[in-house]
Structures are given as C-alpha cells and as structure tokens.
Amino acid sequence: MKSYFKPWEELKFTDDYMFCKIMKDEGICKAVVETILNIKIKQIEYIVDQEELRVSPEAKYVKLDIRLEDEDKIINVELQNMNHQGLAKRARYYQSVSDVEATQKGTFYKDLKDSYVIFICNFDPFVKGLPYYEFENICLAYNPAIRLEDGTKKVFLNITAKDLSKLDFNLQSLYHYIRDEKVESNLTNTIAQKLSLTKAEIEERKEYMTYTLKLMDYKELGYKEGIEKGIEKGIQEGIETKTKEVVVNMLRNNIAIDVIEKIVGLNSKEIEKIKSENEV
C-alpha cells in the first residue's frame, strides 16, 4: 500500500509528530513557552503530549499537542499547520475543560491555576497581518483598562507575518526557525540539535514507522469492512459509511486533515463536514 507520510529523514519541527516529540524535552518546552509568553516558569511539574481530556464519559474529549503545568500555571501549546477555523472557540473549550478537570479533582475555584492556550499558526488566524495576537478578558463598558483578572490568556502566533520588528530577538528567531529553519539563537540551535539527535536514533525511527503503519491500517481495515458491509446494503453505501468512520477515528487520534485527505481521498470540506456532523 502506498505511504502518504513523510520519510523519517524529512521530518521537521513543524511536523505534528516531531513537534510533540521535541517539545517533550523539558528544557526546550520551558524555553519555547517562556519565549512566547515572556514569562518565567519556575519548575515544570508535569508535561505530556497528545493528552486526552474529558470531563465525563459522555462529553466530547479534546486531545492536546502539548500540555504542561508548573506550580501556578497550566499551558496548552498547539501547532496549527492548516486553518480549520474556530480556533478561538477551541481555545475557550480547552480552558473550560481544563478548569472542570481541576475542580473535579477537588480544586476550589479560587485556587485554579492561571490558564494559557498558545496556537502556533502557519497562517494568519485573524487576517490582520499582526505577528502576535494576545487576548484576555477586559471591561468593554466605560473602561477597557479594567481587567477581569480571571487568570486566562489566549495567544496566537502568526508565523507568516512579514513585519516582526516589534518582537524581541529570541521570539523573532523562533519565528524564523519555524518558517525557514534558520538557526539564529541559542534556543533554535538547541531545537535543531535535538531534532538531529532524535532523527539519528534507531528506536525513534522504529516508533515513527509503527505510528505511520497504524494510521495506514485505519484505511485498509476501514475499506475492507466497508466492502463487507456493502455486500448487504450496496457496495458504494458501505464504503462511504466506513470511510466516514475511518475519518472520525483519525480525527479523534489528532491526525492532520491534510494527511487524512491523502489517505481516504476526500477533500478538506468533506472532512470538515464529517467532523462537524460527529462533533469531533
């Protein structure tokens, strides 16, 4: 069966799989987040990639690229290579699920940690040409200088922005590395070295091969079951039904839409429709 995945040697920091792999390095993750948010993280207590959060068995779950905590902050970091719309409401949902999870574990409202959501976008999410969009809740009536101070912030990086002059050097260099793989700072040099070392590891290569083969199995198994179902209800109907199931499964496993397009042969609009219909 034809492979639709990048060869291991060609993976970059901007590929979802490698992004999560590199960001699991505590030092790199800490430095990237500090650079983006211009804050200090005292000590990371917890860091995980591809974490699934669900507030109840019946609730819609979310799967996060990177989630880390220190003593007073929870930070979610997402890499977005394609504009699937709805990022603002997705950020809102991430933070609400994170808060509910914390209170279910016994945390009082007043003790909730500050919550940050970061979207690193290879497109302009608000089409305003700005390199950096930061949002928090303020008073719209009379005095916008009054802040709600609920401890939540949402940050969107527009990696494609042309004018980065208002960003500091370290953040500019991170943009340049993500966009063009230019190494200009200690942080981007560390990321580049980690990338090279990871790609040189035989076990890491094997893990990636297992990952891609598992995804290819979705297609093979899906079409096989679809054809079998089609014997009873019509070949085309069976294949279409199973294709939708395969798409839903892949979306729930956080597979990028451009990858799903190549595997199942649907376009992005068709996949988005399936995503909406199944509340994935």
Question: What is each of the regions a protein language model found here?
Answer:
Residues M1-K153, S165, E225:
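Accessory alpha/beta interaction modules
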Residues K2-E9, Y17, E71, I75-Q80, ...:
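Short, charged alpha-helical interaction segments and adjacent helix-coil junctions
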Residues L157:
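Hydrophobic residues at beta-strand termini and immediately following loops
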